[in-house]
Structures are given as structure tokens and as C-alpha cells.
């Protein structure tokens, strides 16, 4: 994000072309997000109800682990796409941009939370659909603002808006970590025996050991997503005064990578590595929360002194 803070896009033609292609990508993402949402959840109350509770002829409630998995993927990709797009507004004095970014994040977060409201109450299906539509409207509005700013506005770094972005990312980090915790709990478990059985199998539970292909299918996509997420979180720590900042930034990269790769060690080098998996998982949660709260605290403190 260095060029979004102190750089000049319009005076740097290669950078201008890159940002233009980025905006094109964001437009394509927004367009295909309609199809993605319809394919996964459904763009009608009937399809949404079927996603949660099965077809009328064969009603079957979706498993909470499957719901958590779909929701955490949707939350991650939509937040990052919207966050990168919103970051471009940092250089342009567009009116109401703070309100727009907060509204977009709020609608996305409420859409995610509505899944669990539907799951446990079997109501509010229309609310989920409305929140997604509102998020898409705000996403497109942000895209229009970014294009307008790139064409017509003079570039000027907006540090107050940057603080807003950082606080929003920190809040997202907390919410996303909660989602990951419950997904981990439902799919793997929180105790030694749960993790051991998940990777090594258990004949009494008719659970087979994980294959290399199964492990790599989980590890490979998580490698890039975890790197992107924790690199961004560590990167934002550069903007706050912190004594042991470098150590925390290194831990934010090493611990999540250890947690992600620990499954291979359990499967091929012995079940004693279950302790490594559990330790790295709980440490990952702790340092994520710690980093996020430090960013929020600093953002609030600077606004009070402004």
C-alpha cells in the first residue's frame, strides 16, 4: 500500500495502467459475484431456503461445518476485493468516502452474520438477500468513486481515511478469526484426540487417515490466503509505535504457516506433532487478536487527539 499513501498514480504511467487494470478486475469481480452468490447460496428466497434446509421433498438442514466453510470463503474474498478497491480512495478527495467504506463493510458483515440467524431461527432469509444486494450497490458505488477520482480529482493523501481503513481491517481480522475458530472446532476439533483422529483416522469412528492429495487440497489454497491476510495485518503494524513490532510481525507470518503445515507432520512424522498443531493454532488466534486490538487502540487514540 505504499503508493496509496505517498505515491502519485497519474504521474506514473506504468502505475496508472496497473491501477486501471485493477479497477477492471474489480468490475469483473463485482459482476461475477452475482453468479457466484447465486451458485453457492441463491439469489431468490426459494433457493436460499433450499441452501439452508434442503429441497421441500427431501428437507435436510445444512451442517454447521459446511455453512461455516462457505461463509468464511465468501467473507474473505469479498472483504479483500472491497478493501483493495476502497484503498484507492485514499488518494482522492471524494466526498462521503468514509461513510461509503463503513457502510460497505457493515453490510458485508451483517450479511455474514445473517447466515447464523437463519440457521438457528429458520427465519430472516429475505434479510440475507437484501444485505447482499446493499453490499453490491455500495461496492459498485465505491468503484464509480474510484474511477471518478482517478480521472478528475487531484491526488492528495488522506491520512484520516487511512486510519479508517486500518481500523476496519483490524475489526475484520477479529471477526474472521472467530469464524475460523468455529470452523476449526467443527471440522477438526479443539483437543488432542480430535486432531489425531482427523489426520490419522480412527477405525471406531470409521474415519480414514488423510491422504497426501487431501492434505495438499487444503494446504495449497490456504497458503496464499493466509500469507495475504497476515502479511496485510503485519504491514499495518508499521503505522503504529510499538517496541517489539518486528518480533510481532515475524510471528504473524511464521505461526500461521506452522499451523497450516502441521497436518503434514502429524500424518507422516507422528502424532506428537498434534501438540504443534494445537499450540500454533491457539498462538495464531492470540497474536491476531493482539495485533488487531493494538491497531484499533492506536486508530481510536489518534482520532481523539486529532
Swiss-Prot record:
User: Where does this one sit in the cell?
Assistant: Cell membrane
Q: Which domain of life is it from?
A: Bacteria
Q: How does it sit in the membrane?
A: Multi-pass membrane protein
Transmembrane stretches, by residue range?
Answer: 13-35, 71-93, 98-120, 130-152, 165-184, 218-240, 247-269, 274-296
Keyword Transmembrane applies? yes
> Gene Ontology cellular component?
plasma membrane
Write the protein's name.
Uncharacterized protein aq_1264
